């Protein structure tokens, strides 16, 4: 069949146990389409002619990139940690995106279910070579190039840290990520927050990729990282609420937010529109049922209410 059949099969192949371990949940396309508007808003805010990269360190099979144009894709840098997902990502996007981490040659030497060099929370991640035709060979080179804006576009995993020790791939001594250790040491606040994978992704994005006012982060995540943990004390530009029940998970709300890298310690609440997936005048089902795996492209988003 076509590419989307392949994705669906791959999504099913990533058995629920493994998916739960990685904290991964598929992002339904109607939400992706809406979030793509936030990416374009960030791009349109950049100084005229400025180069940029769109970074997704936890891309899975590349659902978030589905609606990007050819031109936009040529700015994208992708990474994912699970081997089956990485192979789908590579086959789907090689030659279309600016870079994929790590290069195929590294992945071919791989053993086990996780990609060597694909762990976004590892110490060496920023210096892992990228497979690219661009001028930067590593993420560190991108970070060091002040003429390139960085726009993050991510739906990070939310599972507990123990997921990292899954299936004996990671020796128990290594089960805490480098970023977790660093965040425990450096984060101003309760160091217990560093146990949460999502917080590690958000904290590390702020630390490494938000360098000046031209850097942005479009993030799918439950709002607690901002509200109670105190991460991303930045200017909120725009966003909406998604129903996490549409992501093969329990019903709860996910904030899809566009953050600009300007400090904001004053704002205590933000108001956004909650959107739910509808098709044929019916609300789309939620939960772990098979129906959720493939929300059709012709489903629409309906504004449910304004939430503060």
Short names for language-model regions:
Residues 1-91, 96-101, 119, 123-124:
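Class I S-adenosyl-L-methionine
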Residues 59-62, 81-84, 155-157, 161, ...:
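An acidic- and aromatic-residue-enriched active-site/binding cleft used to recognize and process polar
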Residues 65, 159-163, 211-212, 225-230, ...:
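Short catalytic/ligand-binding loop motif for oxyanion handling, primarily in non-cytosolic enzymes
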Residues 92-142:
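S-adenosyl-L-methionine
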Residues 144, 148-166:
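Internal, well-ordered alpha/beta segment that forms a basic, Gly-enriched binding/recognition surface
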Residues 161-194:
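A mobile, often basic/glycine-rich helix-loop segment
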Residues 186-244:
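Conserved Class I SAM-dependent methyltransferase catalytic core
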Residues 253-307:
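Flexible, glycine-/basic-rich loop-and-beta segments that form/coincide
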């Amino acid at each position: 069949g076509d590419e989307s059949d392949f994705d669906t099969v791959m999504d099913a192949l990533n058995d629920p146990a493994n998916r739960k371990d990685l904290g991964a949940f598929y992002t339904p396309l109607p939400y992706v389409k809406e979030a793509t508007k936030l990416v374009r808003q960030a791009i349109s805010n950049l100084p005229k002619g400025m180069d940029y990269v769109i970074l997704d360190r936890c891309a899975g099979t590349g659902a978030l990139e589905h609606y990007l144009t050819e031109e936009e894709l040529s700015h994208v840098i992708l990474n994912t940690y699970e081997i089956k997902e990485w192979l789908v990502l590579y086959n789907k996007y090689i030659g279309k995106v600016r870079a994929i981490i790590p290069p195929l040659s590294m992945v071919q030497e791989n053993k086990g279910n996780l990609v060597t060099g694909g762990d976004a929370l590892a110490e060496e991640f920023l210096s892992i070579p990228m497979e690219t035709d661009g001028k930067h060979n590593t993420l560190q080179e991108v970070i060091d190039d002040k003429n390139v804006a960085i726009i993050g576009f991510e739906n990070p995993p939310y599972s507990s840290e123990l997921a990292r020790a899954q299936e004996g791939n990671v020796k128990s001594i290594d089960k805490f990520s480098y970023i977790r250790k660093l965040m425990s040491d450096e984060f101003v606040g309760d160091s217990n927050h560093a146990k949460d994978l999502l917080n590690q992704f958000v904290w590390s994005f702020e630390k490494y990729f938000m360098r000046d006012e031209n850097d942005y982060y479009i993030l799918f995540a439950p709002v607690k990282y901002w509200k109670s943990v105190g991460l991303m004390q930045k200017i909120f530009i725009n966003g909406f609420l998604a129903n996490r029940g549409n992501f093969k998970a329990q019903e709860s709300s996910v904030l899809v937010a566009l953050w600009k890298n300007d400090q904001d310690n004053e704002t205590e609440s933000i108001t956004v529109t909650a959107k739910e997936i509808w098709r044929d005048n019916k609300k789309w089902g939620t939960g772990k049922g098979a129906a959720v795996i493939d929300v059709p492209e012709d489903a629409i988003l309906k504004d449910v209410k304004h939430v503060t």
